[in-house]
Every structure is written in structure tokens, then in C-alpha cells.
UniProtKB/Swiss-Prot annotation:
Keyword terms of this UniProt record: Disulfide bond, Lipid-binding, Signal, Stress response, Transport
Bridged cysteine pairs (disulfide): C27-C73, C37-C50, C51-C96, C71-C110
Superkingdom, taxonomy of origin: Eukaryota
Full protein name: Non-specific lipid-transfer protein 1
Length: 114
């Protein structure tokens, strides 16, 4: 239950910090869409609906600004949420059979995302 509270607070924080533009992708959308990945990334459950969330996110990230927002949010989440297996996070594109134009990692330079 404590983890759910942390995730809810993180999503709320992202929604406040990243002011939405006209139909621009928000950090709240990124974290909400990828919430099904959390049990898998923490070694507490199967992949489940994670790939569907990843594919929806990719479909929503239509512009360079959207992709940079997604990258920044993923990077922040990787740093903020305890117990994430960073190797599993980096492997999500391969497991879900999608192409993400950057590595999912706390060390990713999101300013280079196109």
C-alpha cells in the first residue's frame, strides 16, 4: 500500500511540474501508462499489461518534445522509485518488441532525444 501512495504522489508531482501544452504528452500520462510495468521492474510480478502501456506511450509521443518529456519522466521515475531492476527497464523495448529512441536509464541524456 505504501508503494501505491508513493506512485500516486509521484504521478501528481509530475502533473504539477510538467505544465501540459495543447495536446502535449505529460509526465502524468507517461507514469500512468507505464504503471503496469512496475511489478515486473521490481521483480514482484509478470510483464502483464506493461507492453500495452509502452506501445500506447509510443503512439502518444508524436513530437520530439513529447519524446523528450517521456524520456525525462522515465529517467526521474528510475531514480525515484526504489527497487527497480535497471537491466529489466533497459530491456523493455526488446521484450515488448518496440523501438524506443533512447535507453531507459537514470543516466540517459534526454536532451539528445529526437
Amino acid at each position: 500500500m505504501e508503494m501505491v501512495s508513493k506512485i500516486a504522489c509521484f504521478v501528481l508531482l509530475c502533473m504539477v511540474v510538467v505544465a501540459p501544452h495543447a495536446e502535449a504528452l505529460t509526465c502524468g500520462q507517461v507514469t500512468a501508462g507505464l504503471a503496469p510495468c512496475l511489478p515486473y521492474l521490481q521483480g514482484r510480478g509478470p510483464l502483464g499489461g506493461c507492453c500495452g502501456g509502452v506501445k500506447n506511450l509510443l503512439g502518444s509521443a508524436k513530437t520530439t518534445a513529447d519524446r523528450k518529456t517521456a524520456c525525462t519522466c522515465l529517467k526521474s521515475a528510475a531514480n525515484a522509485i526504489k527497487g527497480i531492476d535497471l537491466n529489466k527497464a533497459a530491456g523493455i523495448p526488446s521484450v515488448c518488441k518496440v523501438n524506443i529512441p533512447y535507453k531507459i536509464s537514470p543516466s540517459t541524456d534526454c536532451s539528445t532525444v529526437q
